[in-house]
């Protein structure tokens, strides 16, 4: 066992804190590098290995950047509002505020034990009034700009959590928090108009250095569709409805239309003889989530309304059906069905024996979903693709029955929550004045402590008289506060703006400072946030820009998703499975640097993998070996009279590995390829060991230069251990104030190389040659090799092919 332990961790953590080593320099913003990991939610009592996998390697990357000369800003905080703390309180009786702050205290201690260079003086905690005051300010600014509004709407309702869920929080028809089946409910809710920014949210994506999969997920979620809106009149009625389609060229093939069960027209056009069946179907559909209804694997169902619509392009009557696979929240809540050219429509038509009429040429069988020439389409026969679409739209426009239209899958962001542990919405309701904003000077609207928050489907704050009853700021009369709280994603949608200016009591942030500090240069967190937090933060940034507070378009220039650390059994860690990995025990046994290095070497950072106790022990042995080698090197330097100053073969060999390591590690760590970086360090370690173990006289000054570079390269990955080794070689300043080494291209040019010699295509020997050797000299060396002579024997040499510095192939018969 070596000397490295948690005592060394504690020693250097204390020194770093005493010397304010990582304090951000606000006077040097030209070289600023804003590095941010998604902050932790303090729902559990402690950080687990997954948190470390997010924070530890990113800290190593930030240290590397600091040594490259960047002024690194790396803050930390806690996303502290939300359902888990409230559910825990209901279960245990411990108040959310008490459990949250206790957990934060524990996690702060753990994060400091990691040795990360977080700027703790910039910490934010979203459940603190000095933070959510400005979350409320943000809501009011959005409200003033018409980007926040309240309306009655069908919402996702979790009967277990007793609260509304955003579409993004429903996974396969179940609540992402408690896995309960999600219902539908009509409630007055607050929304943010993210749809106003749909186009820009799409357009700017391609400019970002983000994973392609994440950009694709956001594009799909926004779901821009370019098509046409077509008007269908209801037969024998003055009713009409519009449908959106991207394939208006198939309009002649419409054989039925389908309305969502929630569509307001359903009751009006359902005939008396079909009413009972339609009502029963509506009730059934109400219990299905939007995601379930849209599932491609689920069999489509529907009922006939009894009414017919008129196809505007050919005047044919088509039946109007009610189907739950149509969503009232998407498009117009009505779709035209072309079973010959749409798989879903084809399956529905086949099931209910509805007509199927080909109107696009192509394919041996139906449905044919590709583009082709229009057929059975009257005057439009023979037209193809965009020309066909334009011609049909032009005809519809001339009849005032259609127009070009762009549609989006994206819905406005529902932010109301009927729960306690969240930021109160700063709105007051007065019988005389109506809806009134809480004046800025009265913020924050503080969350009261003594509240009965057992879930009953109603907002807990509505049951707290001291909170709910207030005075109207306009007329001074009696009024009521908004009882709902804000979705916790509102709190996290802007936290990156607060970090650099977290003690500002007058404003959410100082625009002059923030516009120099932002955007975030490197953002790291899980891919599960692609269509929620990451999208919301982009929206809020653009909204604040348009209000004049920000001069940039995007919050996060570069994004990396870390992988998932699984339990030793290869399954996702969970307390119920008993496969969680607590960092504390391993740090106590091995030290923080061994734990950190294992996470970086044992896994591809963007993929993760299963935990292995054997693998972390191997890293512990590697650190012990490095310690012994560096101790031997120090002794060699100390005892040497430095009577050798030449760079002979052994020195050149080590120097090659040294500079190859500098080059490779610099490139790999920059791309967060930590595992290959540490592999290069291991190669450098082997080269040092070989040099120290050789029998020849050693160059002490060269050896010192080599171990200085080695420790410098090691520093981001093992910060405490590297500082200790740095001190032991007699350097008093912190290694993290050192400049990152640069490789010498000349050192990568070898005097000698080993090449293979083949006889008739099979390798028979390897020889060392000078890189400056001529082709004839290489041939001579190969032919004079004893193994080659034996291999050729009595055969006649027909040809000798030389690929310089790589290969010799001898053809002999």
Curated annotation (Swiss-Prot):
It comes from the Bacteria. NCBIfam families: leuS_bact. A motif ('KMSKS' region) lies at residues 572-576. ATP binds at residue 575. GO terms for biological process: leucyl-tRNA aminoacylation. GO terms for molecular function: aminoacyl-tRNA deacylase activity; ATP binding; leucine-tRNA ligase activity. InterPro entries: aa-tRNA-synth_Ia (IPR002300), Leu-tRNA-ligase (IPR002302), Leu_tRNA-synth_edit (IPR025709), M/V/L/I-tRNA-synth_anticd-bd (IPR013155), Methionyl/Leucyl_tRNA_Synth (IPR015413), Rossmann-like_a/b/a_fold (IPR014729), tRNAsynth_Ia_anticodon-bd (IPR009080), Val/Leu/Ile-tRNA-synth_edit (IPR009008). Belongs to the class-I aminoacyl-tRNA synthetase family. Its EC number is 6.1.1.4. The gene is leuS. HAMAP family: Leu_tRNA_synth_B. Keywords: Aminoacyl-tRNA synthetase, ATP-binding, Cytoplasm, Ligase, Nucleotide-binding, Protein biosynthesis. It is found in: Cytoplasm. This is Leucine--tRNA ligase. Transmembrane segments: none annotated. Its main location: cytoplasm. GO terms for cellular component: cytosol. It catalyses: tRNA(Leu) + L-leucine + ATP = L-leucyl-tRNA(Leu) + AMP + diphosphate. It is an enzyme of class 6 (ligase). A motif ('HIGH' region) lies at residues 40-51.
């Amino acid at each position: 066992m070596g000397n490295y332990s948690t005592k060394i961790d504690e020693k250097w953590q204390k020194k770093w804190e005493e010397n304010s080593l990582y304090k951000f320099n606000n006077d040097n913003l030209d070289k600023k590098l804003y590095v941010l990991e998604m902050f932790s939610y303090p729902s559990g009592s402690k950080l687990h290995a997954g948190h470390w996998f997010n924070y530890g390697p990113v800290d190593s990357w930030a240290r590397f950047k600091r040594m490259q000369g960047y002024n690194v800003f790396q803050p930390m905080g806690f996303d502290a509002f939300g359902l888990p703390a409230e559910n825990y309180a209901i279960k245990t009786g411990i108040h959310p505020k008490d459990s949250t702050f206790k957990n934060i205290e524990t996690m702060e201690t753990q994060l400091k034990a990691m040795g990360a260079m977080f700027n703790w003086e910039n910490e934010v905690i979203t459940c603190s009034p000095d933070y959510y005051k400005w979350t409320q300010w943000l809501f009011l600014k959005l409200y003033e700009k018409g980007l926040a509004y309240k309306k009655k709407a069908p919402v996702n309702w979790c009967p277990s959590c007793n609260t509304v869920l955003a579409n993004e929080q429903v996974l396969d028809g179940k609540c992402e928090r408690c896995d309960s089946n999600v219902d539908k409910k009509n409630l007055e809710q607050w929304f943010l108009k993210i749809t106003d920014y749909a186009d820009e949210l799409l357009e700017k994506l391609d400019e970002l250095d983000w994973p392609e999969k994440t950009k694709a997920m956001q594009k799909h979620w926004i779901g821009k569709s370019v098509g046409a809106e077509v008007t269908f009149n209801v037969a024998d009625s003055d009713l009409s409805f519009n449908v959106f389609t991207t394939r208006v060229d198939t309009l002649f093939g419409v054989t039925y239309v389908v309305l969502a069960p929630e569509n307001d027209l359903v009751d009006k056009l359902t005939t008396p003889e079909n009413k009972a069946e339609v009502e029963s179907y509506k009730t059934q559909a109400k219990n299905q989530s939007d995601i379930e209804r849209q599932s491609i694997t689920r069999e489509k169902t529907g009922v006939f309304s009894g009414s017919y619509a008129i196809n505007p392009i050919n005047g044919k009557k088509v039946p109007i059906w009610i189907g739950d696979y149509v969503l009232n929240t998407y498009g117009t809540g009505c779709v035209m069905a072309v079973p010959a050219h749409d798989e879903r429509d084809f399956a529905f038509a086949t099931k209910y024996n509805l007509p199927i009429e080909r109107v696009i040429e192509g394919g041996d069988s139906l449905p044919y979903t590709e583009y082709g020439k229009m057929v059975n389409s009257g005057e439009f026969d023979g037209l193809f693709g965009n020309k066909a679409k334009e011609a049909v739209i032009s005809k519809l426009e001339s009849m005032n029955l259609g127009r070009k239209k762009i549609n989006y899958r994206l819905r406005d962001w529902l932010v109301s929550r009927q729960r306690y542990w969240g930021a109160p919405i700063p709105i007051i309701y007065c019988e005389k004045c109506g809806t009134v904003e809480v004046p800025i000077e009265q913020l924050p609207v503080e969350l009261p402590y003594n509240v009965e928050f057992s879930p009953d489907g109603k907002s807990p704050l509505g049951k707290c008289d001291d909170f709910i009853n207030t005075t109207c700021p306009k007329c001074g009369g009696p009024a009521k506060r908004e009882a709902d709280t804000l979705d916790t994603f509102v709190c996290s949608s802007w936290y990156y703006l607060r970090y650099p200016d977290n003690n500002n009591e007058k404003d959410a942030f100082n625009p002059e400072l923030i516009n120099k500090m932002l955007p975030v240069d490197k953002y790291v967190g899980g891919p599960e946030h692609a269509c929620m937090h990451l999208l919301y933060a982009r929206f809020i940034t653009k909204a604040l820009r348009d209000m004049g507070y920000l001069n940039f378009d995007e919050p996060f220039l570069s994004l990396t998703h870390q992988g998932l650390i699984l339990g030793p059994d290869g399954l996702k860690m969970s307390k119920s499975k008993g496969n969680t990995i607590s960092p504390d025990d391993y740090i106590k046994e091995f030290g923080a640097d061994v734990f950190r290095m294992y996470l970086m070497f044992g896994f591809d950072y963007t993929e993760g993998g299963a935990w292995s106790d054997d693998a972390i022990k191997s890293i512990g042995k590697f650190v012990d070996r490095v310690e012994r080698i560096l101790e031997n090197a120090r002794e060699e330097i100390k005892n040497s009279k430095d009577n050798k100053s030449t760079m002979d073969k052994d020195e050149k060999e080590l120097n090659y590995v040294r500079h190859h390591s500098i080059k490779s590690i610099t490139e790999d760590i920059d791309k967060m390829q930590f595992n290959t970086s540490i592999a290069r360090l291991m190669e450098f370690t082997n080269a040092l060991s070989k040099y120290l173990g050789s029998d020849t006289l050693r160059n002490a000054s060269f050896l010192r230069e080599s171990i200085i570079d080695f420790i410098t390269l090691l520093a981001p990955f093992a910060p405490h251990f590297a500082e200790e080794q740095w001190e032991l070689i007699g350097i008093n300043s912190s290694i993290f104030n050192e400049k990152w080494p640069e490789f010498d291209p000349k050192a990568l040019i070898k005097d000698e190389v080993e090449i293979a010699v083949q006889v008739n295509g099979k390798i028979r020997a390897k020889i060392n040659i000078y890189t400056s050797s001529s082709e004839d000299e290489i041939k001579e060396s190969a032919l004079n090799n004893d193994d080659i002579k034996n291999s050729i024997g009595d055969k006649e040499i027909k040809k000798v092919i030389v690929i310089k510095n790589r290969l010799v192939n001898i053809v002999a018969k």
